[in-house]
Amino acid sequence: MVYEDLFRKLSRELMRNLSEVISVTKQDLGNPDNKFTRNLLPNSLCDFYTIFSYLAFDWEARELSVDGEKLHGRINILKAEQVLGDWEGIVYFKNISHYESIEKFKVVDFFADEACVGFISDDRSLDYLEYLDFGETETQPLGLTFEGYYELMMMARGFWYWQRVILNLRNGKGYENNVEQFKIYMPQIFPDFKWEDFVALYERVRIK
């Protein structure tokens, strides 16, 4: 039960062991959901919904900040019914030019007001997650199943824009500022975090 075990571990760590370093501003999870349509969702996401129907977790560093903003993290895995809903007006706009695949994009982790992670709802892309900055006309492949994404998300503790670190690892470039902040501040907030372990986990779970 990788989904439940990893979340319980994260919850215990943030709520107890690190209470002097961070504050948990939101923790919410739903009971299992067995009413979703399996053939419309990635396989490993279906496995998640048999454990939780949704998962929301926000934390904020008590002292550490960058450019006047406290360091924080967010996990926001949506309910299946929300994922499969209509994302016009959020992900894409009819009157703005975009790739046709954007209209098939379904948001899974709505971790920021300006960005998210999801999948393109056609047979070719099932169990393969994509990153999207709102306002962009196409997505960026993460090269991860939802299960692999979840494992990395838990190790990253939902650190703000940790997904861009994955894009940098996958492409060998881009988002250098996000990578630098991640490497500097993660060990300061979470003493057991090691960059080398994160990279090793990425290499293990990425789609090859």
Q: What residues fall within each predicted segment?
A:
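Alpha-helix initiation and N-capping motif
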Residues: Y3-F7, G143-E147, F159, Y175, ...
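Short, surface-exposed beta-strand/loop micro-motifs that present aromatic residues
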Residues: A115-D122
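Charge-dense, low-complexity intrinsically disordered regions
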Residues: L169-K208
